[in-house]
Curated annotation (Swiss-Prot):
Short name of any one Pfam family annotated for the protein: SmpB
Regions that span the bilayer: none
Main location group: cytoplasm
Family, per entry: Belongs to the SmpB family.
Top-level lineage group: Bacteria
Disulfide bonds listed in the record: none
Protein name per UniProt: SsrA-binding protein
Keyword terms, alphabetized: Cytoplasm, RNA-binding
InterPro entries assigned: SmpB (IPR023620), SsrA-bd_prot (IPR000037), SsrA-bd_prot_CS (IPR020081)
Entry's Gene Ontology molecular function annotations: RNA binding
GO cellular component: cytosol
Gene behind the chain: smpB
Length: 152
């Protein structure tokens, strides 16, 4: 698995409940851009429209060598390839419990197919985010103290 991009902000902003791997319908130039890691997953989300999942907000830059006549929209919606049962299950859960679906990681699998790891998420409150930051700072401080203690 070759990791192309990761949505680190999603791990901070959301509580991840369940993850799933999905295929992407891409153009040839977009695949080439992915191989050069010219992608940004920040602020992406998944919408289910008429029984099909679409990924919105992913920015895939076009290549410099591409012809001026053919420049696709960099932020266009991209269709996700999922099993129907899984899609219906997530659609019901998301609508019933007011959850969202976001993309976490974009990568090439062993067969060199572009895949995205999507997650069913619940938004964190501000105090939850503050608590996470405090825990991270405390853990970092403890590790630094331990390192200093064992060194000298």
């Amino acid at each position: 698995m070759k990791l192309i991009a990761s949505n680190k902000k999603a791990y901070f902003d959301y509580e991840i409940l369940e993850t799933l791997e999905a295929g992407l319908v891409l153009l040839g130039s977009e695949v080439k851009a992915l191989r050069q890691t010219r992608v940004n997953l920040k602020d992406n989300f998944v919408k289910i429209i008429k029984g099909e999942a679409f990924l919105f907000g992913v920015h895939i830059s076009y290549l410099d060598t591409i012809h001026a006549y053919y420049k696709p929209n960099e932020r266009r919606e991209r269709k996700l390839l999922l099993h129907k049962k899984q899609l219906l299950k997530w659609q019901i859960e998301a609508s019933k419990e007011r959850l969202s679906i976001v993309g976490l990681k974009l990568y090439f699998n062993q067969r060199n197919r572009a895949k995205i790891q999507i997650a069913l998420v619940k938004g964190k409150k501000l105090h939850d985010k503050r608590q996470n930051l405090k825990e991270k700072a405390l853990n970092k401080e403890i590790l630094a103290d331990l390192k200093h203690h064992f060194k000298g």
